[in-house]
Amino acid sequence: MILKTKLFGRVYEFKSVKEVLAKANEYKSGDQLAGVAAESSEERVAAKVVLSQLKLSDLFNNPVVPYEEDEVTRIIIDDVNLRTYEKIKNWTVSELREWILDNKHQNVDIQWLSRGLTSEMVAAVAKLMTNLDLIVAANKIIITKRANTTIGMPGTFSSRLQPNHTTDDPDGIMASTMEGFAYGCGDALLGLNPVDDSVESTKRILHKFNDFIEEYKIPTQHCVLAHVTTQIEAMNQGAPTGLVFQSIAGSEKGNEAFGFDAKVIQEAKDTAQKVGTSAGPNVMYFETGQGSELSSDAHHGADQVTMEARCYGFAKRFDPFLVNTVVGFIGPEYLYDSKQVIRAGLEDHFMGNLTLSLIHI
């Protein structure tokens, strides 16, 4: 494994795979804030050159957070299909990029490949792609998921109806709900961000949504975006729930800051499949976004694209219905301007598609 290259008459040497990944990233204000960004465009190009020549096995053996220290890393590594990985482990990241973009390789081929990839590999290949590359590659991958409705079919577009209210007033919520459905929104989800995160308030809104959906026979699923433990308790007390929501991070420390671990998410999924209102099998709804780990000092010195890819690696374990990347939501300290926001959105869409494309062979 060679971590140095000569460029413009200067030798650039990097200390670790983690540093190569970080400095090969397109410029992001969040990486600058974290102190992991390339110091110049020349160093960024040098890091990309080094990254392009790394083997996939180098990335497999050098996760940005050690296996022994992090639950998310363990989930990502343990879920790799080793038969597929053995066939591609000697590819370079550059060869992986060329393979994905080759017109001979389409949806089923890429879905087979994805089973052998870790999140670090997914992030690495994204860093070598132009915006157009990301669009073309993501567009090859077809992911369909089903709760009560099926989303992701080619040529279709689904939306979330979000009838938030400043005081969680039921009449105000339902007025927004009816207006939104009148516009044809909400086939992906009827989902409210609550002001009151209590079990009683969550139950009340879930019942209200479910009654409305059943009365008018609306083909959708509903959710109150309270904390996952609140939603579990609401379900245990009989509240009708379509999807279970939780914001997730790309490290165990980040998830701890959000107040959960993988066992809690598994409990939520099991409960929703047992007593929820969705036919399934996909009943989970996750939210991510580049930079969230830095907010809780849970990035472990890694860049925000790599940590975002790890979010999808964690999510994959639970076969979610929706994964929503809130690009730019946190603020300009992580994605400063529209150029960075657009790039992040394209990266996230590609990495999410490549990671979450599940097939059964």
Please describe what each predicted stretch is:
Residues 1-142:
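Long, compositionally biased, glycine/small-hydrophobic-enriched stretches that function as flexible linkers
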Residues 36, 46, 171-187, 232-355:
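Alpha/beta enzyme core
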Residues 161-163, 192, 222-226, 247-248, ...:
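A cross-domain feature marking catalytic cores of carbohydrate-active enzymes
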Residues 138-147, 196-209, 255-268:
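Active-site-adjacent beta->alpha loops and helix N-cap segments on the catalytic face
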Residues 69-72, 141-165, 283-296, 328-330:
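N-terminal small/glycine-rich loop or linker at the start of catalytic domains
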Residues 189-206, 327-336:
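Glycine-rich, proline-tolerant flexible connector loops at the mouths of alpha/beta enzymes
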Residues 359-361:
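Conserved small/polar residues in nucleotide/adenosyl-binding loops
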Residues 211-224:
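A glycine-rich helix N-cap at a beta->alpha junction
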